[in-house]
A protein has these predicted regions:
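Non-heme Fe(II)/2-oxoglutarate
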Residues: 89-183
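Short intrinsically disordered, low-complexity coil segments enriched in acidic
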Residues: 1-9, 151-160, 254, 261
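Catalytic core of non-heme Fe(II) oxygenases with the double-stranded beta-helix
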Residues: 173-307, 324
Length: 324
């Protein structure tokens, strides 16, 4: 992936200028495409990858606690109800508490207000402001959204890998056992998206490059519109769920700060137009090695048990799945 430090620029700019100063002097390509923009400006980002990596290190964090996953991170950022549910599941007491965290606003779409704390949202929003005001060029997060931050690119990859291993992957495997087994969500790609007037205001119907997606609304309140609309999935092809795979219905989900939504990546969806204000969300895609996205369902006897789901296996942060 392009997000690992490359040889290009790794030694820093000539003349002893700091990496941060050199990165701020770059003129990045302006993101324009609202569809198929995965490789927009590819040469620029490849050429300056090492320099940008060093610049983010030099900038440093605003909220250091966001950058290291562990007990302190969990206490501050993971909702107490999820911590309790995860502890019970790991102890072999089953997933009753974990399932009780969710409701199903649309068939096949699961929502919860009890995954992350208000401190997580506020600290991450503050970090995004710190990153956005840094002057360091930032690559578009995916092929459709033009504005956001690739979290694995700015130093957050280790903490996010810990979060995925401990909680996000087990929850995805619990909710979608027919798609997520031991090798189907070993890697992740984490980014934020921002919707506002003058930027991206909506997102066309699409499927994600993931087997399962976590989408957390950071806020802050005050926007209008911008619901997430899901479409009944069926048919064939890489980016659709086979009929009979699982319940995957149609309907709208209205975001509010703190609402997390988990859905199959191939459950087609769109972001409806934002009518006012601004909204930021953090999104984590889960997928297999080499960007593989499973769509063929496992038979019941092939699915993981609850105990197997909550045995953490280390994941890897990767670049955009289309580059793997």
């Amino acid at each position: 992936g392009l997000l690992a430090t490359s040889a290009a620029g790794a030694s820093g700019p000539a003349g002893g200028t700091s990496a941060l100063a050199a990165a701020r002097a770059l003129v990045p390509p302006v993101p324009k495409l609202q569809k198929g923009g995965e490789l927009e400006g590819f040469e620029f980002w490849e050429e300056h990858d090492g320099l940008l990596t060093e610049a983010w290190k030099e900038l440093g964090p605003r909220n250091e606690g966001l950058y290291e996953y562990g007990p302190a991170y969990e206490r501050r950022y993971v909702h107490a109800d999820l911590r309790q549910a995860a502890a019970a599941a790991r102890a072999g007491e089953g997933e009753r508490l974990a399932r009780a965290l969710f409701w199903e606003p649309v068939p096949g779409v699961f929502a919860s207000d009890r995954l992350f704390t208000e401190e997580f949202r506020e600290d991450l929003l503050g970090e995004l402001e710190h990153i956005s005001s840094s002057g360091i060029p930032r690559r578009r997060p995916n092929g459709m959204n033009r504005y956001g931050v690739i979290l694995d690119q700015v130093g957050l990859e280790a903490a996010l890998a810990g979060l995925v291993d401990a909680l996000v992957r087990p929850l995805a495997a619990m909710l979608f056992p027919e798609l997520v087994a031991a090798e189907d969500a070993t890697e992740h790609y984490a980014f934020t998206v921002r919707y506002e007037a003058g930027g991206d205001t909506e997102l066309a119907k699409h499927g994600d490059a993931s087997v399962a997606t976590l989408n957390l609304c950071l806020g802050r309140p005050g926007w209008r519109g911008g619901e997430l609309r899901f479409f009944e999935s069926g048919g064939s092809g890489m980016y659709t769920l086979p009929k009979g795979n699982a319940s995957a219905g149609a309907g709208d989900v209205a975001f509010h700060p703190g609402l997390a939504v988990l859905h199959r990546g191939q459950h087609k969806h769109q972001a409806l137009p934002l009518l006012g204000g601004e909204r930021s969300n953090v999104i984590i895609w889960l997928f297999a090695e080499h960007g593989v996205v499973r769509v063929a369902p496992y038979a019941p006897h092939e699915q993981l048990s609850a105990r197997q789901r909550w045995q953490a296996a280390p994941s890897k942060a990767k670049g955009q799945p289309w580059e793997l």
